Swiss-Prot record:
Family classification: Belongs to the UPF0251 family.
Designated name of the protein: UPF0251 protein Hore_18270
UniProt cross-references to InterPro entries, sorted A to Z: RNA_pol_sigma_r3/r4-like (IPR013324), UPF0251 (IPR002852), WH-like_DNA-bd_sf (IPR036388)
SUPFAM superfamilies tied to this protein: Sigma3 and sigma4 domains of RNA polymerase sigma factors (SSF88659)
């Protein structure tokens, strides 16, 4: 009996979840599905430039598992580009990383989703409603 898949830690959920070749009606396009953890593997390795060991550590998987996820993602992207297919980002076995935050005003410690760490997002303290908090 197969072991259930372990959830991979993901720091980023893409806002745009669908790409398609220009000039082809949606009804005529076949799709390739990229899981959220495959998108995360591409982001960490190819965009952030981390080593495979650093990527595996961030995603809380072994290095060989990370390599399999990355290879699968790259193959799917290549297939979509070469064969003119759309890319859809959805699904998978993942958990959204949490960021530990401490309120400057009252000292309360709380968690927010990791993707809210960007400079334009606000992290309000649930105790005093202050938004000046640190990671």
């Amino acid at each position: 009996m197969a072991r259930p898949p372990k959830e991979r830690r993901v720091e980023y959920i893409p806002e745009i979840r669908y790409f398609k070749p220009a000039g082809i009606p949606a009804r005529d396009i076949k799709e390739v599905n990229l899981s959220i953890e495959e998108v995360e593997a591409i982001r960490l390795k190819d965009l952030e430039g981390l080593t495979q060991e650093e990527c595996a550590r961030k995603m809380e998987v072994s290095r060989p598992t990370f390599q399999r996820v990355l290879t699968g993602a790259r193959e799917k992207i290549a297939r979509a580009l070469i064969e003119g297919k759309a890319l859809r980002f959805e699904g998978g076995d993942y958990k959204l990383a949490k960021l530990h935050v401490k309120c400057h005003r009252c000292g309360n410690k709380f968690e927010v989703p990791f993707h809210h760490r960007h400079r334009f997002s606000r992290r309000f303290c649930p105790e005093c409603d202050d938004e000046k908090n640190e990671e």
